[in-house]
Design a protein with these regions (language model features):
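Feature captures hydrophobic
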Residues: 1-180
Length: 180
């Protein structure tokens, strides 16, 4: 069978589903660890649901901001206020695996956005911070617009992946020095 057969496509979708679930919990973990993410998510309307998925019929992940909490809903089908869709699994994998940045994918029209574009840009900023926590420095130097600034280590971020909810109470906009 050719390298583009249905088995290969199914394997890519399964890999993308696993990475999306880690990314979903990674956003919640970053909201627990980093004031910048908490501030950005607190700027979303209340209540607000965001879904990141792969078209057509691909895997996805959803987050809901309700009150002072951000929750990862996993791959459940929910009515969302913002839908960010990768055009195919082949287009999504380089971004999800760290070969390309989220900003590059957006600039190269690899994703479609349905909903409020300002919230989509907030999501992109948050995902850049999440990638800074989850990917090693050698990868983040290549895909992030500026070097990742982490206030906690990789192991702490990986440990925070077990949580599916985070409190997002923020009083003021954090600066780079006080981002922890």
């Amino acid at each position: 069978m050719a390298a583009t057969g249905w088995r290969v496509k199914r394997g890519r979708k399964m890999l993308a589903a696993v990475v999306l679930q880690v990314l979903g919990r990674g956003l919640v973990a970053a909201a627990r660890l980093d004031k910048r993410v908490r501030f950005e998510v607190a700027s979303w309307p209340d209540p607000y649901t965001v879904t990141l998925m792969i078209a057509p019929w691909g895997p996805g992940v959803s987050w809901r901001r309700k009150g002072d909490t951000l929750a990862c809903l996993g791959s459940t089908n929910v009515d969302c206020d913002l839908l960010v869709t990768f055009k195919s699994v082949d287009v999504a994998l380089p971004t999800l695996l760290g070969a390309k940045g989220v900003l590059d994918a957006l600039a190269e029209h690899r994703v479609m956005v349905k909903g409020d574009l300002t919230v989509a840009m907030v999501l992109v900023r948050c995902l850049n911070i999440v990638e800074g926590y989850l990917f090693p420095d050698i990868v983040t130097r290549r895909i992030l617009p500026r070097p990742a600034t982490r206030k906690r280590g990789h192991l702490v971020a990986y440990g925070a992946l077990i949580h599916t909810e985070a409190l997002i109470q923020v009083k003021a906009r954090p600066t780079e020095e006080t981002a922890a």
